[in-house]
Amino acid sequence: MSRFYQVTRDNVTKLAELLTQESGITIRSALGAVDRVRKKFFLASEFYSLPPSGIQNEIAPRHGRIAGFLPSWNFPHEIVLQRIAETLFAGYPVVLKAPSETPLTYLSIAKLVDPYLPKGVFNVITSTGKTKHQ
């Protein structure tokens, strides 16, 4: 899981520029958001690799459960990505329906982390956002 940290560290500028283009926040804000997500990935990977400390805690995912995320286009990507990282580290697969207005940041993250995860563990779904009423 520390690969998430490495991947985001190696692509901070690229992700920040994409976030700026897509959601309209300043590059400075985007760099800060990506940096905070990167640090959360690092902290989560460190937490899950700590040796037991006398009190036995165990994270046991329940088979067949999937976490779904439906963020709005203007919801801070940073918060969504932190929750996704925590969910993946806890052992649950994730399905994220990217907002039709801002899918590129989520698709880029998925592309970066995909080589380090088993197939089907992190999924991003996109759509045009249009529905047809019958």
List the model feature ranges, each with a label.
Residues 1-57:
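N-terminal Rossmann-like NAD(P)+-binding subdomain of aldehyde/semialdehyde dehydrogenases
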Residues 51-134:
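Rossmann-like NAD(P) dinucleotide-binding subdomain of oxidoreductase/dehydrogenase enzymes
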